[in-house]
Each structure stands twice: as C-alpha cells, then as structure tokens.
Amino acid sequence: MPKRRTTAIGACTDPTSSRLLLVTLGAAARQEGYRNMFQMDIEVFEQVMVFIVLAIAGVALGYALWLRNFIMSADKGNAEMQRHWGHIRDGANAYLRTQLKTVAVLIALLTVAMFLSVFVVKPTPEANEYFDGNEDKARLVIAIARALAFVMGSSFSAMVGFFGMNMAVQGNVRVAAAAERGGYQEALKIAYRSGTITGMLTDGLGLFGGTTIFIIFGKASPDVLLGFGFGGTLLALFMRVGGGIYTKAADVGADLVGKVEAGMEEDDPRNAAVVADLVGDNVGDCAGMAADIFESYEVTIVSSLILGLALTAINGELYWIVLPLLVRGIGVVSSIVGTYAVSLWRVDDAEEAMYKSYEVSSGITILSTFLLAWLYAGQLSLATLVAVGVALAVTFNPLTSYATSAKSKRVQTISAATRFGPASVILEGLSLGYLSSVWALFVIVTSLAAAILVYSYEFPNEYKLPVALIGLVLAVIMIVRGRMRNHLVEGFFAGMWIMVFALFLISMHQVPDVHRYSYILFGVTLIGVGMLSHTGNNVSMDTFGPISDNANGIGELSGMSPKARQIMADLDAAGNTTKAITKGVAIGSAVIAAVSLFGSFFSDIQRVNPDFEKIVNLADPVVFVGLLIGGSLPLLFSGLLIKAVNRAANLIMAEVRRQLRDPEIASGAKTPDYAQAVTISTHSAQIELVPLGLIAVLAPIAVGFLLKEQALGGFLAGVILSGQLLAVFMANAGGAWDNAKKYVEDGYFGGKGSENHKASVVGDTVGDPLKDTAGPALNPMIKVMNLVALIVAPLVVEYEGYSAGILIGVALAIALIVWAVRRSDREDTLAAEEVVERVTAEMVSAD
C-alpha cells in the first residue's frame, strides 16, 4: 500500500500515529499491504470498521423492532375508534399489495435486463482484477450479482414503504387513544416513535445493502451497486407516482364536494371519500416518502464508492472508499440518539422538540466526523464537506418553513388574499412558489461551491492558526452567551457552526488540475452523504405528519372529546410543517445525488473511452438538443401526473355526490360505502404506473443511442436543472396554499364556512397534486434517468454509429414513449358519473 499522503491542511502531520491512537482504543492492528476478501490492500483496521458499520445497520433494525414492540403494546382505544381505524388499515394494505402486483412484471423484465447488461459491455477493469483477470467469470458473476442487487434494492424499497406504512397505520389509532387518555406528551411520543420505525428501516436497510455488497465484492462493488441503486430508485418512483395519485385524488374529491359544495367539516363521516383520503395519507406520505429518501440514501452510497475508487486509483488511499460508509454509520447512531430524545424534551410544541433533537443528531455527527477525518484520514476537508451537507439539510428547515408555515408572513399574505377571491389566492401562491425555487437553488449552489472551493484554493499557512483561534474564541463566546440567556443548546450549536466555518477555511487546499474534477465530484458526494446522514430524523419527521393527520381524522369520525381533538389538531398542525420541510430536504438531496451521479456518468464513459473529455459542449447543436429534451421531461411528467390526479378526482367527486343523494347518508343516519371510493382511487392510481415508469426508463436510452454520449450528458443536465426548480416550486406553492387554508380555518379572515374559507380551499385543492404528487415524483424520476444513463453510457460509447439493431431499438423505445404519453394524456369522453359506473362494473367482473 502506498505511503499516506500528508498535507498542510489543518490535518495530522503523522496520520500513522493517529491510526495507532485508534488502535489502542480497540481497533485491530495495522497491517500494510494485507490481501483480503475485498481484493484491495485494505488494512485490518479498515476491515473492522466496515464490519462495525454493518453491525450499526443491524442496531438500527433492532431499534426499529424495539420501537415496534413499544407501539404495539399501547392502547388502541375504544371499539368505535378501532372500527374506523380498521377501514384505514385494510384500505392501505390492499392498495400496496395491488401496487406491488402491478409493478412485479416490469421489475421481472428489468431484472433480466440487468443480467444481460453485463454481457453487452465488459465489466470494469477493477471487476476483472477482482476475478484475477478472468473476464468470462467476471461477466457471469457480476451479471448475476447485479440482477440480484436490483431485486434486493427494489425489495428493500418496498419493505421500507410497506412496513413503515403499516406501523404508521398501527400508530395513528394509538395516538388518538393517547390524546384521549394520556395528554399531549404521550400522544407526541407515540406519533413520533411510530414514524421513527420507518426512519430506522430506511437507515438500516440502506446501510446494510450497500455495506454488504462492498464487503462481498470490494473494488468490483460499483458494478453491482448500480443494480442496487436502480432497483430502489425505480420502486420509489412507482411508490411516489401511485401513492401521489391515490392520495390527492381522494383528497381533492373529498374537499371539493365535502367542504365547498356540502359545507362539511374536514373528515366528516358522511363524506364517502373520507376513508380514502386518510388511506391516501399513508400510501403517499408514509410509503412514498420513505421509499423516496431510501433511494437517495442508496444512490449516494453508489456514487461515493464509484468516485472513491477513482480517487483511490489516483493516490492509493482507501479512506476515499471507507470513510463515507463510516460517516453513514455515525449518522445512524446520531439518528437513534436524536429520535429517542424527542420524548425527553418537556415542551408543549412538537416542532420545537423535533428541531432540538435534529440539532442533537447534527452535533453528534459533525463532531464525530471531524474526529474520524482527523485521526483516520488526516484530512479535515472531508469532515468539512460532510458538515456542509448537514448544514444544507438544516438550512432547508427554516427556508421551507418560511415559505410554507402558517406562522410565516408569506403564507398569511395568501390567507389575506382570500378576501379577493380564489384567483388572488392562486396568484399569491404562484409568486411565492417561484421565488422559493430561487432561494432553494442558491442554497444548493452555495453548498456545491463549497466542494469547488475546498479543492481549488490554497488557504495561506500563516493564517491558519489565527483563523482557528478566532473561530474558537467566537464559539466560546456564543456558548457562554447562550448559557447566560438560558439557551445553552442554541448557543452551543451557534458556536459549533462558527467553528465549522473556520475549519472549512483552514482545510481549503489546491489539488492538481488534472485530478481536480474527480476531487470536486467526490466532495459533492460527501455533501450528499452529510445531508442524508440524519435520514432517520428526516423520515421520522415526515411520517409524523400523516400519523397525526390520521389520528385527527379518527378523532373526528369517532366523536372524541374536544380536549383530545385539540391535542390532535396541534400535532396535525406541527405535522403539516414537518412534512413540508422534509419534502425540501428530499428535493435537495435528490439534486445533490443527481449531481454525484452526473459525475459518475462521465467517469463511467472514461472507463470505456479514456480519451473522452469530461465536458458537455453546449455550443454543439446536438448537445443543446439533448439539453432541451431533458429540460422538457420534468414538465411532461408533471403535466401527466396532474392530469391523472384530476381525472381520478372527478371519479371520486362523482361517487361522493352519488352517495350524498341518499337522504339517510346526507343526514348521518346511514354509513356511506367507504370501500367504493377506496377501490376507485386504487384502480385509478395503478393504471398510471407503467406508462410513467416507461417514460422515465426509456427516455435516456433513446437519447443516448440516437444522439450519443455528449447529448446524453446535456440531457441529464436539463433534467436536473428543470426538475429541481419545478419540484421546489410545486412543493412550496402547494404547502403554502395548504397552510393558508388552515390559517383561515383557525378563525382568521372569516374562519370556517365563510366565502374566504371557500377561496382558500380552492387554493389548497390546486396545490394538493403539486405538493404531494407531481413535485415529490420528480425526485425519483431525476435519479431513475441518471442511473439508466449511467448503465447505458458504456454501451453508447462502445457501439458507435447506427447499426440496424440500434435503429430498431431506438424506434421501439420512442414508440413505447409515445404510447405511454398518449395513454397518460387520454381524454375521458364519458361524464364522470358514467365512468364511475363503468369502472365499478370492470372491477366487479375482474373479481
């Protein structure tokens, strides 16, 4: 193993002695050049660390099991509560089972494609070396492993969604019972811990899958991890698309008929779509978001190993590969500590408790990562980039809250616009959504600039010590100031961020121009690793929202006491804000992960064609065509999704109106047929999955083989830029309209039942498919296209020209895309009532 490189970047002058320090703390002895199962010169110390990471993944899953037992032991409330809860549980489980059956055929076909892809393009040199130069053996083993990894990735994504959603459903009735019996703190504990199960499943399975593949395949793992990442990403796309259409079709249909036309309250039991609405919260916000963040978690592992191997080839250091896995392990531990601490804060504000716990997790991760980078790698720059990622996630909290919280002046301005009708509400929300996209973009740009600065500029040595001392003094001042004002936690974290900034400046160092691109891309990947280091916290905060919402709905349907209803309303309000915040984090992480994959795309091409330059020349008309096509696809995808929601919502509205014509249902004397609306929503969501999935998978294939690799690079750039801006716009505009409506419902500007309230409901209805369907679905769509491009890029380079086979394949891909667009953009010629009858008849005959 080459001697470790030492640099004057605020690092250890003798990293070997740092290693020995860790060894004395319990690590195994250092052995140079040890040949092992990884087929790399990896030391025993690093082997032990990797297996510890695997053990941490097991701890996360064990913690999820402990939380599950805690939730299941809680009281489920009275018979009336359990009756309504049973409808929600059965509907959610039936939906996910139907969805998995729908996508199973496509998953099976793509598993075969993953297997065959290795035989079309030879494995990487690292994979051949791993199998001692036996290319035939390498092809066969990698082909089998990639196909199995694809199945494992999609299965893990489905498990996170299914089991996480199931525990959210189990938790919601128990939250309602706790609000009736135990009060605010008990209800908060059960709601958050129910969501934490999903967070720990995401952490544990993501870390387990990536680490296991690395342990088995070592330097050949990127060839296999492509399948793992693609499987998780594709399943997440289906979960987002299907769950998003389901939840918003039911929500829009229930609101427009129930609130606007019939003047009903939220979750009125006379509304036939109320159970479908509550089911939708689980399949969309629980299962969909969990799978979404899980695949971002996977993708950053894939990128870090691909780019880490590239840097290891440059200077022989293995910490480029191992350190991201160790940071992930630290993140899991910090998430366990932080999520457990939520129930320990004695505050009557759920948001405050969750934010404090997030800060605790952030502090543990940052301090531990700096210690790891200093003692293990001897490079503080690695820790500062992870800290930038953590800071990026933390920054999205106030940024998204400013755009979407009911406490924000921006949102209250939208509420005030209800005095002038729905059009004014829509215009205010559009303005806020567009502006917030720019704010979010600049935050992401700033974080990416950090990766550029760290490896592009040399901080003068004579200023390093003074800057460190100034940072330390300012940090101490902030801590003391916080202690004097009884805000020690806030003071500590303010001081910590000041010190991080000082260390960031100190760690800046210039790398050789020839390798700078690879270093910067790895830095971007570390930012993504840092941003998702608290995946457990993020998913817990997001799942807390639908759990509280469902508990509130069960309380309304069951006629619970006003005190309990108020507790659940307060939790629901906090959940709306945390859901919006985690959407921002999910979008930001999707962009960072996509940029990392973008860099891996060029590295992948260079393995096949070493002369390929890592430049996308926009002056080339063909490349510009690729850019335009890529930029248009998020718009196409969003348009088709919104139309699908509207089409399904019309069916729900027709069904609710039909049932309300029954005087007994309208008076409350008879229970509506809730199952009918659930069935319509399920059927409507499933028929959209395959067409939209085909567009995401086939578009980069068609562009790559028709316009070649440079245009494919432009295509990806267009998808990332357009998708990020559009996703933030839709998420924040929709969230702002939602909370503007809730602000009116709290008694401002006329309150419930007023004309102003009806105007706010219109705004909320417009925003629903934006924030919960189209916007979130763009996250996995961006990464599906990037991963498909990563897989086909070597094929595009290796098979130059336009043979008959390539032209036939491209024509077939384009034909399928056209079919998918026409299928999703279809017009229903029948009236909604007639469609309901037709769909019902089809489902009855199918049964």
Question: How does the language model describe each region?
Answer:
Residues 8, 12-45:
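Short, strongly hydrophobic alpha-helical membrane anchors
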Residues 4-6:
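Low-acidity, Ser/Thr- and Arg-rich intrinsically disordered low-complexity segments
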Residues 31-847:
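Hydrophobic packing and interface segments
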